Swiss-Prot record:
Annotated organism of origin: Arabidopsis thaliana
Family note: Belongs to the acireductone dioxygenase (ARD) family.
Catalytic activity: 1,2-dihydroxy-5-(methylsulfanyl)pent-1-en-3-one + O2 = 4-methylsulfanyl-2-oxobutanoate + formate + 2 H(+); 1,2-dihydroxy-5-(methylsulfanyl)pent-1-en-3-one + O2 = 3-(methylsulfanyl)propanoate + CO + formate + 2 H(+)
Residue sites binding Ni(2+) per the record: 99, 101, 105, 144
Pathway(s) annotated for this protein in UniProt: Amino-acid biosynthesis; L-methionine biosynthesis via salvage pathway; L-methionine from S-methyl-5-thio-alpha-D-ribose 1-phosphate: step 5/6
Lineage, opening ranks: Eukaryota, Viridiplantae, Streptophyta, Embryophyta, Tracheophyta
UniProt protein name: Acireductone dioxygenase 3
Residues the entry annotates as binding Fe(2+): 99, 101, 105, 144
Keywords: Amino-acid biosynthesis, Cytoplasm, Dioxygenase, Iron, Metal-binding, Methionine biosynthesis, Nickel, Nucleus, Oxidoreductase
Cofactor: Fe(2+); Ni(2+)
Subcellular location: Cytoplasm; Nucleus
Amino acid sequence: MGEVVKDGREEVIQAWYMDDSEEDQRLPHHKDPKEFLSLDKLAELGVLSWRLDADNYETDEDLKKIRESRGYSYMDFCEVCPEKLPNYEVKVKSFFEEHLHTDEEIRYCVAGSGYFDVRDRNEAWIRVWVKKGGMIVLPAGIYHRFTVDSDNYIKAMRLFVGEPVWTPYNRPHDHLPARKEYIDNFVKVNEGGVIDASA
């Protein structure tokens, strides 16, 4: 069953290199010509991904297995849209500030869609479009940012190991141990190493 879920990831999670345009952050920002990345290439940066059944998350055995194997004991939901989030425009701009966390950021899109932008090894931005059913894990120490897309709506399950800690450290915070560990594990790694994107 897990293989079927894994094989359909590209339908709910897509990644591409971004252009340098200053246009609205909610636009796709494709390069011309478009330059897509595989989810396995994303995994080389530590970004893991799954496709799950968002309509049945309460009883989904695959989600339960992932939570148990990775120790995700706490869960809540975050809805990002003008109607549900106070100070919506201010919040959306703050989410788009480049930052890192000292813990993994786990997000499972159960409705809507949004963009998670991550830096590659050469500091280029990769845009990761997560739609309903897509779950991603951003490793501790990776510089990233988030924005809704032009639909202005995402409902995401947030998962944590233990008590929820969501402290953003805006760039630069290269001195943090989580950043140094990220660089050692994913930036300085042997280019020949292969990492499974749904590990």
